[in-house]
């Protein structure tokens, strides 16, 4: 069995790490590079950086901090934000990122997934999916431009349909951002994860809702995800990554040292 991955997520806006609740009301957490270094030293398996307003602002992620991060950490990291072409992705990978993640641009142009997978290999291409549970319809719906409250909108895609579509087009990994749980810290949406897991054949990363160590264990044991992504519990030092891995080992879950 492959070891499960623990992945801190750093939302970036205006060159700083920020964190919101349910994708709103972001507060500044701190500078990018020291946080990245701290997480690498604590034992994170990889890091994910989202330039959260790049797509809605119509620009590509700022590459200057990508290079600075690459200099100070020795674990893989993934970068997302406004990547609309193979050229955009190439620049970010050249600056030191190991993977690129696309979300809103893939919804606007699904062919982009295939173009990137063909050029860089599926192992480099992550698709982020922002999924919102609509209580009225009882459906999980994919949302777009979630980095900017004023531009966030529902798409025509239901989550499981989009998961299947992006796999067909060459996604090497899927990060499922569960919007209703984001920043609330009351646990991952296990029901949704199981639903997506049933149609997802590539590595699946859970995102949104981690508040305690047992939430990570539940995602791994009850939904069989490959990795668990979290932000506020790490930023606010509610959970230490080294201690989390120790706890998971005690639960019989295989993690990397």
Curated annotation (Swiss-Prot):
GO molecular function ontology, one term from the record: imidazoleglycerol-phosphate synthase activity
Disulfide bonds: none
Keywords: Amino-acid biosynthesis, Cytoplasm, Histidine biosynthesis, Lyase
Matching SUPFAM superfamilies: Ribulose-phoshate binding barrel
Catalyzed chemical reaction(s): 5-[(5-phospho-1-deoxy-D-ribulos-1-ylimino)methylamino]-1-(5-phospho-beta-D-ribosyl)imidazole-4-carboxamide + L-glutamine = D-erythro-1-(imidazol-4-yl)glycerol 3-phosphate + 5-amino-1-(5-phospho-beta-D-ribosyl)imidazole-4-carboxamide + L-glutamate + H(+)
Chief location category: cytoplasm
Database matches in InterPro entries: Aldolase_TIM (IPR013785), His_biosynth (IPR006062), HisF (IPR004651), IGPS_HisA/HisF (IPR050064), RibuloseP-bd_barrel (IPR011060)
Catalytic-site annotation from UniProt: 11, 130
Entry's EC annotation: 4.3.2.10
Pathway assignment: Amino-acid biosynthesis; L-histidine biosynthesis; L-histidine from 5-phospho-alpha-D-ribose 1-diphosphate: step 5/9
Superkingdom, natural source: Bacteria
Transmembrane regions: none
GO CC field: cytoplasm
Compartments reported by the entry: Cytoplasm
Family in the record: Belongs to the HisA/HisF family.
Quaternary data: Heterodimer of HisH and HisF.
Function: IGPS catalyzes the conversion of PRFAR and glutamine to IGP, AICAR and glutamate. The HisF subunit catalyzes the cyclization activity that produces IGP and AICAR from PRFAR using the ammonia provided by the HisH subunit.
Protein name: Imidazole glycerol phosphate synthase subunit HisF
Organism annotation: Vibrio cholerae serotype O1 (strain ATCC 39315 / El Tor Inaba N16961)
Gene field: hisF
